[in-house]
UniProtKB/Swiss-Prot annotation:
Chain's gene name: ycdX
Family: Belongs to the PHP family.
SUPFAM superfamilies: PHP domain-like
Binding-site residues for Zn(2+) 1, renumbered to this chain: 7, 9, 73, 192
Record key words, sorted: Hydrolase, Metal-binding, Zinc
Disulphide bond pairs: none
Record's keyword annotation contains DNA repair: no
Lineage: Bacteria, Pseudomonadati, Pseudomonadota, Gammaproteobacteria, Enterobacterales
EC numbers on record: 3.1.3.-
UniProt-annotated binding residues for Zn(2+) 2: 15, 40, 194
Necessary cofactors: Zn(2+)
Protein name per Swiss-Prot or TrEMBL: Probable phosphatase YcdX
Residues that, per the record, bind Zn(2+) 3: 73, 101, 131
NCBIfam families membership: PRK09248.1
């Protein structure tokens, strides 16, 4: 098991079922050292208000030896790469994931989806693109992976895509992983947990990476320090409380 999980939702996204405390308890049981809460951006129908994200600054950094990153899974809104995260939200957040979600940005043709995703990557506002292998949103894998490598943005391999949602993602995710491998970029693994019980579960992700001989040194979840180095290289100030994770 990798000790970092970068994608999960709490009851603040009302189609999810666990609290921050639930995730902390599960992290302790499973040996997760660092995790990110990434509730849906406010343009989703059942997402929390933008004040929810701004107020994350009151969270403790470490609880019982488990580090907590303040994050969001923002929505890509348009072909210009705009996301539903802005202003003071950026000041409170450590990790910004962004992806396509049908209630906010309907599926388009391959060229339009690719243009939108690359614009988001190039904006400098995101660290990870969520579930880029979604078959509802065809993209040019090579072009997206090369843009992501250029701008130091990771592409996610999402464990939930193989179990509960986005059915038919396997071939696309293998193509994503191979394209990132060839471009020299990063992948991030996300459980996309909507209940704490699936936190840290990456078994299906690892099958995808093994199938394309993906280099483990380009996986962000290998250690807290690797993930923090990545975020710091993107401009996040070092967080003293995480020094001993």
């Amino acid at each position: 098991m990798y000790p970092v999980d970068l994608h999960m939702h709490t009851v603040a996204s009302t189609h999810a079922y666990s609290t921050l405390s639930d995730y902390i308890a599960q992290a302790k049981q499973k040996g997760i050292k660092l995790f990110a809460i990434t509730d849906h951006g406010p343009d989703m129908e059942d997402a929390p208000h933008h004040w929810h994200f701004i107020n994350m600054r009151i969270w403790p950094r470490v609880v019982d030896g488990v580090g907590i990153l303040r994050g969001i899974e923002a929505n890509i809104k348009n072909v210009d790469g705009e996301i539903d995260c802005s202003g003071k939200m950026f000041d409170s957040l450590d990790l910004i994931i962004a992806g396509f979600h049908e209630p906010v940005f309907a599926p388009h043709d391959k060229a339009t989806n690719t243009k939108s995703m690359i614009a988001t990557i190039a904006s400098g506002n995101v660290h990870i693109i969520s579930h880029p292998g979604n078959p509802r949103y065809p993209i040019d894998f090579k072009a997206v992976a090369e843009a992501a490598a250029k701008h130091q943005v990771a592409l996610e391999i999402n464990n939930s895509s193989f179990l509960h949602s986005r059915k038919g993602s396997e071939d696309n995710c293998r193509a994503v992983a191979a394209a990132v491998r060839d471009a020299g970029g990063w992948v991030a693994l996300g459980s996309d947990s909507h209940t704490a019980f699936t936190m840290g579960e990456f078994e299906e992700c690892l099958k995808i990476l093994d199938a394309v001989d993906f280099p483990p040194e380009r996986i962000l979840n290998v250690s807290p320090r690797r993930l923090l180095n990545f975020l710091e290289s993107r401009g996040m100030a070092p967080i003293a409380e995480f020094a001993d994770l």
